[in-house]
Design a protein with these regions (language model features):
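Short coil/turn segments at secondary-structure boundaries
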Residues: 11-19, 39-40, 121-123, 133
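Short, solvent-exposed loop/turn and secondary-structure capping segments
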Residues: 36, 73-74, 121
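A short beta-sheet element
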Residues: 26-27, 50-111, 134
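Sequence-specific dsDNA recognition surfaces
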Residues: 1-14, 28-60
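Non-catalytic DNA-recognition/assembly elements of restriction-modification systems
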Residues: 1-9, 144-168
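A short glycine-rich beta-alpha junction/loop motif
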Residues: 83-91, 125-145
């Protein structure tokens, strides 16, 4: 149904702030249902980034190492990039079905209270304040997927409700 991988791994001294090379998205770039570029984003030379970690349309990004409160933040990539990757503490979830509504539905399901609680249950404490969401354990979660036409209908309804909430 999907592939899960971590983003680019590099040493701190290989990162730069001169906005040259590949932009690296970290946990702070991921908000519920969206991602943002920030002024303090780090960049690394292309030689340190595996081509399969470059973000493509329909991929979902989520923090892999984070605080308990941030488990379940998901963002769907809206277009193909040639110079943006995720960092090593971020999961890149690539659905085998390349359909934007399918990716949105997966992200919405993964952000549901039920699945957030399930993800919290499979995390391991890593250091004083961080939790590590294991890739293999994440792959074992069950996702209820309806037929594609129903997925589109559900996504439309969720978007309509979210739009109504945001306009208040």
């Amino acid at each position: 149904m999907l592939e899960i991988q971590t983003g680019a791994s590099f040493k701190k001294e290989q990162a730069n702030a001169n906005k040259k090379g590949i932009r690296i998205l970290r946990g702070g770039n991921i908000l519920p249902n969206k991602y943002i570029f920030k002024d303090d984003d780090v960049f690394v030379s292309e030689e340190f980034v595996n081509a399969n970690t470059i973000l493509k349309k329909n991929c979902i990004i989520t923090p892999a190492v984070t605080s308990l409160e941030n488990i379940g933040k998901m963002a769907v990539i809206e277009k193909d990039y040639n110079n943006v990757s995720a960092g090593g503490f971020v999961f890149i979830i690539s659905p085998y079905i390349q359909d934007f509504n399918h990716s949105l539905l997966l992200a919405y399901f993964l952000q549901s209270p039920f699945l957030i609680e399930a993800m919290r249950g499979i995390t391991k404490k890593s250091g004083a304040a961080f939790y590590n969401l294991g890739k293999e354990r994440l792959k074992e979660l069950y996702l209820p997927l309806p037929p594609m036409t129903e997925q589109s209908r559900i996504v439309s309804k969720i978007n309509e409700i979210l739009s109504s909430i945001m306009s208040r």
